[in-house]
Structure formats: structure tokens, C-alpha cells
């Protein structure tokens, strides 16, 4: 019997570990979806209605949209602050505590946007309040991504980390699908009612999503890697400063990797709605295409994550960055056909192929660049500083280019530049995958 006991114990331990990991994955994905719903609902509203509701009327409707995306970019400027604050909390007090606070702040800010008066009702106070709440959203989202990724990747077996870490991004896709779906439902209202009050519904509905998300996060177990570091007395008193001191190159690499991934994503998923209006494509067609593309990408990113466990992180990420450059012009060619199937194809290729290969690999890749005691701070700092220039500025630059040239080709060239920055970064980034024994 003595010889059987170790085998029985190991099986029980493996089953318990598998159940715990599954619970962490499900809870993390659900919590991430709740938070990213709040974040993406602003991006959709900025593309569709915020320009005419919160900014002075002008002869060129793109000017109002430009103002809405400027407020969108301000949220990204606040993200590094969130990365520093919540990275410190996550490395000092645990990933779980940080994630609960990010969701609380995001929920309050998003619900508040749904209560704001418009420019016609309150004048300049309206865009000022919008910017203030957008800043709060930015602070919360700055601490969200790194924590959500690490909760899964730090509990996953090394040989399957790419696959499991990719699951964290399903929350991002899920939040986007939920927010776009909410706006599709709201747009079923007559246009006048949608502009008068219907646009508020997706923001006000976030209170239900927010409450569920807090409950889910509060009941998450702590990261296994963090608990081991804490028990060994290896937590840092000043993790952000230590990350900068010990991992300056890795932080720069994380920033460069983010440029094509984040910048491309917001051009495909946010700016495309603006371009659709410019090109005379029905907004319902564009929203449907975006939702379809995100659903397809949610499955694709898992496949890319698994492939990164087999081939390595760098080759898979390179596929995405190079594909982004290749798709820069064909993406708009397909949109300009005004054919719904070809529009759907453009969005699916842009997201599932180009962006999917990068976002499916990024969580494991950047997490493996940093040591446990400063990992949250290092990941958050590199990820969120890049967000200012990539996600925050990309749709703003794209709208400005479209407004000035009234053509898509400058935006295509800009997409190619984003891809080139990441390709060069990959050439200087070390492979982090641990080969299977």
C-alpha cells in the first residue's frame, strides 16, 4: 500500500491543481470582460455619437469626432499612472487586491459617463466632465491588463503558459463584443431617441456588470508565484523603481512589442467605425463586422497562444506584425467595396490574423521577461506607457490624417509604420519560451 500512496496523492494533487487553474481562468476572463466592457463602450460611443453630443457643432463632422478621440487619448495618458499605482499594489500586496480596485474605479467612471449632460445642456462643463471620467477610466485600465494576465500566467504550467495566458485576452474580446452588442441594441431605437437618451443605456447598464465583476474578483485565489515570493520574503518595497533599475531593456521591449498590437487594434476596431461613416457604410454593418471579427479572434488568439508554446513566442509574434504591414492597404480596399461579406472579411483578417497572433502571444511573452517580485510593475509600465502612443494616439492620428487628406492611404502608411516598429523590436527581444522536456 505504501507504494500506491504517492501515486494516489499525486493524482489528487493534479486534479486539485487543474480545478483551481480552471476556476482562475474562468474568473479572470469573466472579470476582464466586465472591466473591458466599461473601457470599450467609450471607444464605440466616441466613434458614433460623442463628437456631436459633447463638442461644439462644426461644418466638418470629423472635427467633433476628433475631439471625442482626443478625450479617448487622454485616458491612455492616465494609464501609466494606473500601471505604477496598481503595479505597486500588485507586487506588494497581491494581484487580487489590485484587480478588485481597478474594477471598482472603472465601474464608477463608466456609470458616471452615462449620467453626463451634453454640450447643448451644460456647455464646456460637459466635455470637461467627460475628460475627467475618462481619466479615471484610464487609471483603472492601466492596472487591469497586467494583473489579469499574471493571475493566469503565474498559475499555468510553463510548457502551456502561452495557451493559458492567451485566455486572459478573451476577457478583452468579450468586453468588446458586449459593448458593441449593447450599442447595436441601442441603435435599434429611432435615431432621434438614440441621440437623446439611447446612447446612455450601455453606460448605465455597466453597473450590473460591474457588481458581478467585483464579486467574481473578490473570490479569486491569489497568484501562486506571488504567494511563493511572499513566503520566501522576496517581495520588493519599491517594485516600480526596482523594475526600472533591473529591467530597463525589457521595459523598452515591452513598449515596442505593444506598438503594432495596440495601435493596429484601435485602428481596426475603433477608427474603422469612423472610416465607415466617412465612406458611407451603414454603422450597423460596421458594428456587425467588428463584433463578428472579435468573436473569430477570440478563438484565433487561443490557437496562436498554443502555437507559441510549440514554435516560440517570437516567431508567432512576428507573423502578426508582418501580417499587419501586408494588410495595411488591402484592409481599406475591402471596406471600399461596400460589400458586407468583404467588409466582414477585412475585419476578420485584420483582427484574427494580424492582431490575434500578437495579442495571443503577448501575455506569456511580456510576463516571462520579468522576475516575479517586480513582474506586475514591469509588465504594467512597459505595456501602459506604450499605450499612450499606440492605442491612445493611433485613432487620433488616423482621424486627423483622414480629415486632412480625405483618403485612406495615409492611414495605411501609418499602419505599416506601426508594424515596422514592432518588427525591429522583435529582432532585439530574447526568446522566452521554455521548451517542453
Model-predicted segments: where are they?
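Extracytoplasmic gate region of multi-pass secondary transporters
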Residues: 43-44, 248-297, 390-394
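Extracellular/periplasmic helix-loop-helix junction of adjacent transmembrane segments
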Residues: 46-79
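Cytoplasmic membrane-interface "Motif A"-like loop-to-helix N-cap segments
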Residues: 92-103, 310-322
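Glycine-rich segments within core transmembrane alpha-helices of 12-TM secondary carriers
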Residues: 163-184, 382-394
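Multi-pass alpha-helical transporter architecture, strongest
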Residues: 213-220, 416-437
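Helix-loop-helix hairpin linking two adjacent transmembrane segments in secondary transporters
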Residues: 172-217
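C-terminal ends and interior cores of transmembrane alpha-helices
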Residues: 104-123, 323-338
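C-terminal transmembrane helical hairpin of 12-TM major facilitator-type secondary transporters
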Residues: 315-361
Amino acid at each position: 500500500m505504501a507504494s500506491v500512496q504517492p501515486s494516489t496523492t499525486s493524482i489528487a494533487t493534479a486534479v486539485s491543481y487543474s480545478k483551481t487553474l480552471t476556476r482562475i481562468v474562468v474568473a479572470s476572463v469573466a472579470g476582464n470582460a466586465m472591466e473591458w466592457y466599461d473601457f470599450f463602450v467609450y471607444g464605440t460611443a466616441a466613434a458614433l455619437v460623442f463628437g456631436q453630443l459633447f463638442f461644439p457643432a462644426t461644418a466638418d463632422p470629423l472635427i467633433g469626432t476628433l475631439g471625442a478621440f482626443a478625450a479617448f487619448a487622454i485616458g491612455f495618458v492616465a494609464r501609466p499612472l494606473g500601471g505604477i499605482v496598481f503595479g505597486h499594489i500588485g507586487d506588494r500586496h497581491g494581484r487580487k487586491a489590485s484587480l478588485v480596485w481597478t474594477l471598482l474605479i472603472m465601474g464608477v467612471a463608466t456609470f458616471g459617463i452615462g449620467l453626463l449632460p451634453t454640450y447643448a445642456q451644460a456647455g464646456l462643463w460637459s466635455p470637461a466632465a467627460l475628460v475627467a471620467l475618462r481619466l479615471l477610466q484610464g487609471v483603472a485600465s492601466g492596472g487591469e491588463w497586467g494583473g489579469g494576465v499574471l493571475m493566469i500566467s503565474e498559475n499555468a504550467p510553463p510548457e502551456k503558459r502561452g495557451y493559458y495566458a492567451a485566455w486572459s485576452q478573451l476577457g478583452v474580446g468579450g468586453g468588446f463584443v458586449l459593448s458593441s452588442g449593447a450599442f447595436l441594441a441601442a441603435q435599434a431605437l429611432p435615431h432621434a431617441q438614440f441621440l437623446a437618451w439611447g446612447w446612455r443605456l450601455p453606460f448605465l447598464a455597466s453597473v450590473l456588470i460591474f457588481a458581478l465583476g467585483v464579486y467574481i474578483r473578490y473570490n479569486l485565489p491569489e497568484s501562486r508565484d506571488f504567494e511563493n515570493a511572499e513566503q520566501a520574503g522576496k517581495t520588493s518595497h519599491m517594485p516600480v523603481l526596482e523594475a526600472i533599475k533591473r529591467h530597463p531593456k525589457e521595459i523598452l521591449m515591452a513598449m515596442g512589442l505593444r506598438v503594432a498590437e495596440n495601435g493596429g487594434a484601435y485602428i481596426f476596431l475603433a477608427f474603422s467605425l469612423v472610416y465607415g461613416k466617412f465612406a458611407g457604410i451603414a454603422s450597423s454593418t460596421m458594428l456587425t463586422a467588428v463584433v463578428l471579427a472579435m468573436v473569430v479572434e477570440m478563438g484565433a488568439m487561443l490557437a496562436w497562444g498554443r502555437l507559441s508554446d510549440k514554435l516560440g513566442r517570437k516567431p508567432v509574434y512576428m507573423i502578426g506584425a508582418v501580417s499587419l504591414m501586408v494588410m495595411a492597404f488591402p484592409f481599406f480596399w475591402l471596406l471600399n467595396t461596400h460589400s458586407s461579406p468583404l467588409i466582414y472579411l477585412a475585419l476578420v483578417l485584420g483582427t484574427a490574423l494580424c492582431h490575434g497572433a500578437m495579442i495571443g502571444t503577448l501575455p506569456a511573452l511580456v510576463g516571462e521577461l520579468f522576475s516575479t517580485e517586480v513582474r506586475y510593475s514591469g509588465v504594467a509600465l512597459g505595456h501602459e506607457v506604450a499605450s499612450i502612443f499606440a492605442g491612445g494616439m493611433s485613432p487620433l492620428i488616423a482621424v486627423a490624417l483622414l480629415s486632412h487628406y480625405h483618403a485612406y492611404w495615409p492611414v495605411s502608411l501609418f499602419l505599416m509604420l506601426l508594424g515596422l516598429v514592432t518588427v525591429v523590436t522583435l529582432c532585439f527581444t530574447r526568446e522566452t519560451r521554455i521548451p517542453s522536456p
